[in-house]
């Protein structure tokens, strides 16, 4: 994880700083429990990437109310109880993708979107920006907005479940590269050709990210270094 690596590099320079990690693996309950344990331990600072907007908010509010500085990274909650937010403008990401697709289709065509985890702030904001961009092009039809979970398998399953609608679409946009690649595999298995696939992130991760982006028509790069 790039963030973890950079945090480690910085803390190596400060012998009196202890850095603790916890991975919730996209599990709301586990993330809540982990944050509770850090609160009980009396940590001096929390850096959190909330799995989903609503379910993690109460425990983050609790930490903030106890006077613990909270930095939200990449994802937000539905509360203003945090010290700082570090992340990209995901509404702008969605708008950029929407404009690219509109220009690629010359203002006319059919599109399918695969969202990330429904209640995660990047999925919400990217969809918002995407819809805003497409609203300027009345001849572009957003046929379906499918639910994924940021994984290649969820992209595959979501398209499989909507294969009838997918048959005559022109472009599939996955809100990240892995979902776009999963969709591409599902369409290929169904014998559907001549569809363009657009992804997002191009992060340097094993088995995805940049390697997925190379197999797509386009990908918007989601910056992750030195925010």
Task: Spell out what each predicted region is.
Residues 1-227:
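A residue-level marker of the well-folded mature domains of exported/periplasmic proteins
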């Amino acid at each position: 994880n790039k963030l973890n690596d950079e945090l480690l590099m910085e803390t190596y320079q400060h012998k009196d700083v202890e850095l603790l990690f916890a991975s919730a693996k996209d599990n709301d309950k586990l993330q809540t429990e982990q944050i509770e344990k850090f609160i009980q331990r009396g940590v001096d600072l929390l850096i959190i990437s909330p799995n989903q907007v609503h379910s993690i908010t109460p425990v983050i509010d609790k930490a903030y109310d106890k006077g613990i500085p909270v930095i939200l990274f990449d994802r937000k909650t539905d509360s203003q109880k945090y010290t700082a937010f570090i992340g990209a403008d995901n509404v702008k990401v969605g708008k950029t993708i929407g404009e690219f697709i509109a220009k690629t289709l010359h203002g006319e065509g059919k599109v399918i979107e695969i969202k990330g985890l429904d209640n995660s702030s990047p999925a919400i904001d990217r969809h918002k920006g995407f819809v805003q961009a497409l609203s300027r092009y009345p001849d572009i039809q957003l046929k379906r907005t499918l639910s994924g979970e940021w994984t290649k398998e969820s992209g595959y399953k979501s398209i499989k479940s909507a294969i009838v609608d997918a048959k005559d679409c022109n472009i599939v946009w996955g809100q990240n590269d892995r979902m776009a690649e999963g969709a591409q595999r599902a369409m290929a298995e169904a014998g559907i050709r001549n569809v363009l696939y657009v992804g997002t992130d191009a992060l340097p991760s094993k088995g995805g990210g940049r390697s997925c982006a190379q197999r797509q028509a386009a990908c918007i790069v989601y910056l992750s270094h030195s925010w």
